[in-house]
Amino acid sequence: MEQNNGTTEHPKEVLDQTNPSNEVTGVPNGNHAEGEGDQNAGEAPGLFQITVKLPHEPYKIQVMVSNQEQVQDVRQSIVELPGTFQYTSFHLEHNGERINDYVELSEVKDLKPDAEIVLVEDPYTEKEARMHLVRIRELIGASGDRVDNLHGICAGLSLHDSVAAGEQLSDDIPSKEENSANGTAEHALVGYEVPGPADLRTILPRKQAPFPKTVKSISLSPWNPPPYHLRQKGHLLYLQVTTNEGEQYQITSHVSGFFVNKCSNSKFDPFPRAAPKNYSAHSLLTLISLISPSFENSFKALQEANNKKDLLTTFPFQNSIPHNPWLVPPTSSPATAHQSDITRPQENYLIAGVDNSETLRDWNEEFQTTRELPRDTVQDKVFRERLTSKLFADYNDAAARGAVLVARGEVAPLNPTEGRDAQIFVYNNIFFSFGADGVGTFASEGGDEAARVAVAKDVMGVKAVNQLDIAGLFTPGTMVIDYLGKRVVGQSIVPGIFKQREPGEHQIDYGGVDGKDVIAKHEAFVPVFEKLSKALRVKKHPVWDKDGARHELESSVETKGLLGTDGRKYVLDLYRITPLDVLWYEDSENHEPYPHRMSVLRLELVESYWRFKMGQYVKEEVEKRRKAKKEAEEKAEESKPNGEAADASENAESEKKETTSPDQERVDISDFKLALNPDVFSGQVPQTDEEKEEWAQDEKEVRDACNYLRSKVLPELIQDLHDGDVGFPMDGQSLSQLLHKRGINVRYLGKLAALAKEKGARLQALTALMTQDMVARAFKHIANRYLRNLPSAFATSCIAHLLNCLLGTEVNSKPRAEIDESLREIYPEGDFSFEQVTPTALKEDIEKQIKIRYRFSLDADWTSSLRHLQLLRDISLKLGLQLGAKNYAFDRSQLKNQDHSPAANGTRTPEEGGKKKKKKGSDQASPRPAQSPAPAVTFVPDDILNIVPIVKDASPRSALSEEALEAGRISLMQNQKELGQELILESLSLHEQIYGILHPEVAKLYHQLSMLYYQSDDKDAAVELARKAVIVTERTMGVDSADAILSYLNLSLFEHATGNTKVALVYIRHALELWKIIYGPNHPDSITTMNNAAVMLQHLKLYPDSRKWFEASLTVCEELFGRQSVNTATILFQLAQALALDQDSKAAVNRMRDAYNIFLNELGPEDRNTKEAESWLEQLTQNAVYIAKHAKDIQARRRRLANLPTRLGTKPQPQVGQTTSEMANAAEARGNASLDPRSIDELLKFIEGGESSAPRTKQKKRAAARNPKLRGSKQSTVKPSS
């Protein structure tokens, strides 16, 4: 049954009716995870339909509901349906009795399928009237973009719809060369140049037609608010509406609804007009349709325009912060034009009320009461995790906004007499401080540098504790933002943290007080800290106070326990939950001192080391058993006569086969224990010999863990990348994700770059990428140093000057900072030292920073090998820059392009300047800055349109949805397909309910599920999920993120599998264009993509084009892997086939011979690849002349050969860091990825369309019912048929 809660489809302006932030369903869609919720097994909630009776047209609607939905979810469905979204203030009745909004439908008396409930309009309150106005403005398209401190320009942008529709690229910047495929091209790859320059227009929003205007304006009236005596009569607000006909109406918002009043701009008379103009209605939407004849038609056109977009592209963010693009349209573009909107300054009042108290929340109490919610049943867990996810999202949003204000100096400190770094702030019930050593806490650890690192580590520690979710242990809400060079920490206020204790009492109840001099202990903390330490592999250990007294602690001495005045046990300062990386410091003899002593091992490394040691333990146990068994058998044989011994040995052999293996596999690991002491090497002094011996053992274990990182983890990563066993990183972000996944700290970039250099040319791309990332990170540290004490008005001047010194030296070797001197005078205490920076000084500073922080020496000519655009992007993402789009000139030859760019200097082009006729709508674009007569530079301050905060949060992931996903995967691996798919759908629904639709975790799940469905040969479901993965990835991680590229590539693969090859090529082209921007040409993983493109072109019988793409792939492969590699031979094999199909038989023979020779040398004559190449070579050689004349006829006569190397099948793109073992399921599900099990005959039929693809199976409609989360899409999500 298809679920759409009625007969009309959703409006695009409103949330999906199963809005994850409002729905409180226990188990989604009535499906239960296997093995869970047995207590509800008999209830089987299911879906059923009810009728809602309305007071106005259409008078009745049908709504699909579930027993376990709450009544407020039904309300939300009604509010979001196009026929009923004018209702906001109402209640529901059943059998004449009012239904409580917060009960489940199963608790409503006598409510059965097809029952009728009645919608009854309620009187408005002042708050409901304000919310009604905000909602109606959004519905009718009258609200402009909100400007705030957190969401930047084009936040949450998605390009998928524009790419899929083949829309023209933005004209905000001129193309360097018009090489894009036009609408008449045979396919999307026509004109694409593999080594060509990056086109920045690829990541800009396409030009959009303006939306239909429904009203000219709708706002609060100048007569608002009502005077006291009229408030007593029920007047709530006064509004002013100007219709498209040009008529202005003054409207009174009354407790009973809305009516047109008799006010004018100069006369106050807020009472209803006389008939026949006495328009009134309960809903403002209805009233506007009464006073404006054109409203209904224009509103319908607006809905139609919105319905053309995918719902996910317009869906509002609920549980995550949208991604801010680093490159945005220039200020001259209509996309970023600032437009007049009288209601924009009124929105704070409309949303938060007169005194703003409606948005003030007790964050800490909300966090802790949410943690204390029951978690006994599945429904309890779902409700608890959904509330947790929403709460963290709200807190992160509020804390980030407050932190920006603190960083800009707009919040008064609580201690204004202290130094700037020591000041603390409270804003919106959140406690803020700077990530600097204002009071000398970290003086011995590295001062400000140590404090800055410690607060970031603390957030990671809080996140780890939140994920463990230990009952009885609480953490404050914690997040960190980096903004304008400052690091600001935001924490929820723990009750009692500011309380002055009695003399003799400590501020802290467990752990170190005032550094490590005094140790506090409280027995109530021991049980919960014991659980925490066990989960984090932390060893219980002694510490000593300043008097040498011994104290046994469960955690690091740096980790604090505080008993709040609310009676809860809080854990604070979680920056030292893993040991110090001692080998890093001991290795500093040959290097300059590291800036701080806060360099600890990552939790992922500790977990990896634990698994490694456990593996060793299991091997030793198995070896012991084998040895013991062998000795027992030998003794038994010795004690028996010869005849019996012979018989016994035969029996023993057979029994050994049956029993030994399972016994050896089962090893009890409960005796295996490994925990690390986080306080070794940090100044503790053991007192007795026994203590010293124990401490030495702890130190040895930590050294072994550090050595494991250096001697095993680092070389293994380099080897995996060398062998192509993991997806190759594309930019700084994907590189750091890869390192962190393996437990490698970013400080090891230098060590990794040195190891990559030793591997030679094959890892040259990795060395370049790591060098680029080190330069970007060093630049970030330097920029932060100059920005920290600089007035915010000069931030763009500082950044533009530093960028000119790094990236613009070929345009101007002696750039000068552009500063408004008159503005400088009003900031006498500002630090303007950035003006003194020169390209030479900056280069030396970067080299120094890299040497200190990464222990790596750059080549003398490193500046000449910079990839300017990619480095600019990395720097922008690290500093939160949003740059105006233009063709940035990185050398003098590019200046011409820049000069003619509309965004470069702001002047009109000759064509524009020559026209005297005023263009329609030109008054809406923002004015352009006047051209500066200053010398040419690459960057000017006006290029930096915005700076957004970089947020680090402590939000935990959903354990429940991950468990369901893992259970589904295991079931599929065990060939329990139906159960596996059921659990996976369960996980999908849980993800969407808990995180909301727009969240990075949901994007990752869509990506994973699309691959699972593709492997299960459910191609339509794979396409639908891959499309969703693309959109959600773009909006939450960035339109040019590495994840977005992978999502586009997999979507192209799935589209091709369903027969939409031309669409697939559109996606491939877009992904390749993105690749050029974030990495440049010739990325190692692009070989797979180019091969896939070539195969798709063969599928379309475009053999010459296919041949070109194989040749391009071969060029990249030879450059990366060398001429004599198996990879190169594989592509030569494919290219030979392509050449044969392109009727170039001589070249085909030569390429196949090259492939054969490489296979022979590298793999030997008996290898399958060698034999297949030999077989093909014989056939091609014998039939060279005939193939050239008629390839199909000749090949149809060829005998069937053994399996052929692939090379004509498309392959999925591995995710960055994904190992081949992680893709093993794909190989099992689809056969060996490197082999194509078809004969030459079949290959020819495949290439020429004889076996294009399996017909698309029609999916059962019930699939939509199983996942109503996806009901809002234009097409119902296709699920696998069972």
UniProtKB/Swiss-Prot annotation:
One of its GO terms (molecular function) is mRNA binding. Its main location: cytoplasm. CDD domains: CLU-central. Residues 1-43, 631-669, 892-936, 1202-1282 are annotated as: Disordered. It is found in: Cytoplasm. Pfam families: CLU, CLU_N, eIF3_p135, TPR_10, TPR_12. Residues 1212-1223, 1273-1282 have a biased composition (Polar residues). One of its GO terms (biological process) is intracellular distribution of mitochondria. Residues 924-936 have a biased composition (Low complexity). Residues 1257-1272 have a biased composition (Basic residues). The keyword Thylakoid does not apply. Residues 631-641, 653-669 have a biased composition (Basic and acidic residues). Belongs to the CLU family. May associate with the eukaryotic translation initiation factor 3 (eIF-3) complex. This is Clustered mitochondria protein homolog. It comes from Coccidioides immitis (strain RS) (Valley fever fungus).
